[in-house]
């Protein structure tokens, strides 16, 4: 059985002077690319789960304001749809405001253990409130109090006052009402790139771009 399935270290093939991954990461889609990149995304995430990647859905999401000034942060992919990936935030946060001004965004999944990357590009669309209600109730209830009292990205003037307000809400049994600004965005993908650490620095890069006729794929030089 391939060592990557068992999560055992495999030195040699995937080693690089600049990358520290030690788990063999199969990339069968590079030789026979499927027509739909979302199936590749599902496959990679499932393999990452099997080999024990610590945070496989931690997406470094880059947004930009109306003047093109970028900002980045980590969000968690909560769901994969047929057209993109979903994550939750607060509408009044910096990313929420920027996505309202400029919906184009780019995200990267980087898995150090296997030296793999997935680059996701597209436009963010705010989902209906019903989706936000669903996402809110899926969160651990212990996260509700602070998420309810916080006005994400606004200046924090009194740490203890905010802590006390959250502790007061924590006395409530069960879920709290969803805060008005809590929302879900879908990053509807226009392109994806799957990157694998290859032999002799011939890294394996498989890119998909959406077109009027559907998805088109091509291999890129390292």
Curated annotation (Swiss-Prot):
Note on how the cofactor is bound: Binds 1 FMN per subunit.
Function text: Involved in the biosynthesis of the antibiotic phenazine, a nitrogen-containing heterocyclic molecule having important roles in virulence, competition and biological control. Catalyzes several oxidations in the terminal steps of core phenazine biosynthesis. It oxidizes both hexahydrophenazine-1,6-dicarboxylic acid (HHPDC) and tetrahydrophenazine-1-carboxylic acid (THPCA) and thereby contributes to the generation of both phenazine-1,6-dicarboxylic acid (PDC) and phenazine-1-carboxylic acid (PCA).
Name of the featured protein: Dihydrophenazinedicarboxylate synthase
Record SUPFAM superfamilies: FMN-binding split barrel (SSF50475)
GO biological process: phenazine biosynthetic process; pyridoxine biosynthetic process
GO molecular function terms noted in the UniProt entry: FMN binding; pyridoxamine phosphate oxidase activity
Family as reported in the entry's similarity comment: Belongs to the pyridoxamine 5'-phosphate oxidase family.
Lineage summary: Bacteria, Pseudomonadati, Pseudomonadota, Gammaproteobacteria, Pseudomonadales
Gene name linked to the record: phzD
Keyword Cell inner membrane attributed: no
Taxonomic superkingdom: Bacteria
